[in-house]
Amino acid sequence: MKQIVPAFFIQLALGLYSPAHSNAAEPPENRIDVVLLGTGYPRPYPDRAGPSTAVIVNGRYFIVDAGRAVVLRLSALQQPMPQIAAVFLTHLHSDHTSGLPDLFNTSWVMGRKQPLQLYGPRGTQEMVNGLLKFYAEDIHIRRDLVEELPVKGAEIEVHIVSEGIVYKDDDVTITAFGVDHRPVEPAFGYKFEAGGKIVVISGDTAPSDNLVKFARGANILVHEVYMPGYFAKARSVEMTRGDTTKVTQRLSRYHTDAEQVGKIAAAAGVKKLVLTHLIPPEDSEKIRELAARNFSGEIVAAKDLTRVLP
């Protein structure tokens, strides 16, 4: 006879009932708030997961980007995986997607019974096709042979986004808008409207007039940022090592520096500015101070699991 292990004990064993971070206590119902799941960038830092932000509406988690270790950060929130309503990708750079396979698989193992809802730019379906092929044997074992997990939970339903409303229900309206991350095209930010509040996530972008338009009057703007001069300094180090590539030299063209992000927040008239994707994280306080030169509202230089209320 097959022995059935209660789901709670499985979740406990996998660490999905670990103690919550002190900044991340569960919110009351009927409101929107934001948890920064990952605030790092491609270079790995032990205390910074890859880019990922949770927008929580009435207890349902909408995940924007899924960088490395997103599942570990969700576990720190004691978050039941089936409450993930959907995942939204701003673009397909690997630092924003490397945690997606784990999020898909673990949420299924932990009880998700329906297809994972995934929204992203063109190319998302091809990425998902590869992901499912990569996991094909594992899915077969878990679904058909050993655990008899829900069949539909092993699926991903892809929604290719363009500018405009991409998701709407009784609680929340989510709008995608184009940002400037060229040569990466398309790249999107997302605007969440719920309970009379507005939260905007920039994704990766250089200063963008379109972002200012969509962020106008937002309660919270979550925006990427880098320290002015950082890329030039990094380029100088590379040159002394004989590195003739131009990757670092070009990075400043499609990201936003600290002084620029303050101007963006001021132009949009947002109430709170939350800085994420901090480059480099060790300069986060200096970055915050530079942003404050051009924006008089509240500024949060986020760490992983920082919770922000509108």
Which residues does each predicted region cover?
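Binuclear metal-dependent hydrolase catalytic cores
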Residues: K2, A7-I10, N23-K213, R288-L309
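Short amphipathic alpha-helical "recognition" segments used for binding
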Residues: P6-A7, G15, P228
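C-terminal segment of classical bacterial N-terminal signal peptides
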Residues: L12-S22
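Cap/insert and terminal regions of metallo-dependent hydrolase folds
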Residues: F188-G189, I198, A206-T306
